[in-house]
Amino acid sequence: MLKLFKFLFLISSLYFIGCSSIVNKKNAQLPNNKTYAIGSFWNYTETPMAGLRAASIVESVVAKEGIQLLSLIDGDEKNALSQSKLAFLTAEKAVAKTKGANYLITGEVQEWRYKTGIDGEPVVSYSVKVIDLNTNNTLFNAVGAKSGWGNKSIGVVAQEIAKELIPQFIN
C-alpha cells in the first residue's frame, strides 16, 4: 500500500511540474538605479491586445521592485499591426531613448487563451527581453509558459510568470 501511495505521489508531482516552464538563455544582473522603459509586447496570438495586457502585467511587477520605469504602453494595437516587428521595435527604442531610458523592456506573446473544453484552463506563454539602449544588445532574454486550473484567470497566470521572470534580472 505504501508503494502504491509513493507511486501515485510521484506521478502527480510530475504532472504538476509539467504545468509551467521558465527558460532563461541569457542570465543578467542589471542595476536597479537606472531608468527602464517598458513598451508594448509583440502579439503573435489571435487574442486582441494580448501584447498590451502582458506588457501591463510585467510593468506592474517591475514597478513593485522599486525600479524607475517609463511606460510606453499606449493601449493601441493598431499601430503595431500596420508595421513590421523590426519597425515596431525600432520605434519603441527611439521613443525610450528620447525619454532618457537606459534599458528597454519588451517581449512577445506566443499564447494567451483559454483551452477549449469543459475545464477552459488558461494558457499563457510570453517572453521578456531587456535591451541596452546604448549598445543595442539584448542583455536578458527569457520565456515563460504556464497553464492554470479552470478557476484561474489568464491575468493571474500571466502574473505568476512575470513574478518568476523579473527577479532574474533586477539586482
Task: Please state what every model-predicted region is.
Residues 1-19:
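Sec-dependent bacterial lipoprotein signal peptides
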Residues 2, 21-23, 170:
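Short, aromatic- and cysteine-enriched interfacial helices/patches
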Residues 70-76, 98-102, 161-171:
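Short, highly charged low-complexity linear segments
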Residues 32-40, 45-99, 137-141:
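N-terminal segment of the mature soluble domain
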Residues 43-46, 76-79, 110-115, 146-149:
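Solvent-exposed loop/turn segments at secondary-structure junctions
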